[in-house]
Regions:
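N-terminal amphipathic alpha-helix/helix-capping segment at the start of soluble metabolic enzymes
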Residues: 1-20, 134-149, 206, 212-213
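Conserved N-terminal beta1-alpha1 strand-loop-helix module at the mouth
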Residues: 1-68, 74-75, 174
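Active-site mouth loops of central-metabolism enzymes
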Residues: 10-26, 69-73, 151-164, 224-230
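Conserved, mostly hydrophobic/aromatic
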Residues: 19, 32, 43, 91, ...
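Catalytic cores of alpha/beta
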Residues: 30, 34, 70, 75-89, ...
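Alpha-helix-loop-beta-strand connector modules within alpha/beta enzyme cores
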Residues: 51-85, 107-115, 144-148, 195-219
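Conserved anion-binding
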Residues: 78, 90-173
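C-terminal alpha-helical cap/extension of soluble enzyme domains
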Residues: 117-123, 127-133, 148-151, 157-161, ...
Length: 249
């Protein structure tokens, strides 16, 4: 395992740059490394990532010094553990609506004594290689502490219920921070299809302000990201517009 590259960038006094994937594409990870991205994020809630693909994504990204974070499909502990066992070093839990749900998220991501993460035998625990665990970390307990230090745990606040229960969510010790979900949040506030509605914008600002006051991160405090859809719909569209009337000869 490598040091969390997002946290490493933060130690340098800067936000990490993150390239987001919605489906497995190893060549994109290599190109992301070539242009200087710090980390990779995969969207397991709306994307499609078989377990074997997550293994490969982490393997390639880590080889270039980039950590991989993920939004998981759901917040069940077994589901989160499948991602962590592949080598994921940051988890965003979608639709966290209560303090109990935030606590369960943190517990699933962090080893005891900070949490209740199950010990596996995959990449995420150095294949349970006792020699490596002893030499690099001073044993399993040392690895567990190292892993917890290098884990980012984020609750996605995208429902009015979560906003109502925000104080309880922010009180969870193992939670690193919160992020938003403008479309679903707007919908829960009665404004479907209006992610930029003033009420949603104000609600998200309130969430992030209170998170920072509680010692957590909010929104894009520690990283800034872009995905292939934004690149294609932005830069690629500009390219087509600039060249679609080019003449032959």
């Amino acid at each position: 395992m490598i040091e969390n590259s997002i946290l490493a960038a933060n130690k340098e006094g800067r936000k990490a740059t993150v390239f987001a994937l919605a489906h497995p594409a190893l060549y994109m990870i290599e190109m992301a490394a070539h242009v200087g991205f710090d980390a990779i994020n995969i969207d397991g809630e709306h994307g499609g990532f078989p377990e074997e693909a997550i293994d490969d994504i982490c393997r390639v990204a880590n080889g270039y010094g980039m950590s991989v974070t993920a939004r998981v499909p759901d917040n069940a502990a077994y589901q989160i553990n499948l991602y962590l066992d592949r080598g994921i070093q940051g988890v965003t839990g979608p639709h966290i609506n209560s303090g109990a749900e935030a606590q369960a998220l943190a517990d699933a991501c962090l080893f005891p004594v900070d949490g209740k993460r199950s010990w596996g035998g995959g990449r995420g625990t150095e294949f349970n290689d006792q020699t490596i665990l002893d030499e690099k970390y001073g044993g399993k307990l040392g690895f567990a502490k190292w892993s917890n230090t290098n884990m980012i745990v984020v609750a996605q606040i995208e429902d009015k219920k979560a906003w109502d229960n925000l104080d309880d969510i922010l009180a969870v010790p193992g939670l690193s921070g919160v992020t938003g979900g403008p479309h679903d949040f707007a919908q829960s506030l009665g404004h479907p299809g209006e992610p930029d509605h003033p009420e949603r914008v104000a609600a998200t600002l309130d969430v992030e302000t209170r998170a920072r006051a509680a010692g957590k991160t909010g929104g894009g405090d520690i990283s800034t990201g872009i995905g292939i859809a934004e690149l294609m719909l932005g830069e690629a569209r500009a390219f087509v517009a600039a060249h679609k009337n080019d003449k032959l000869g």
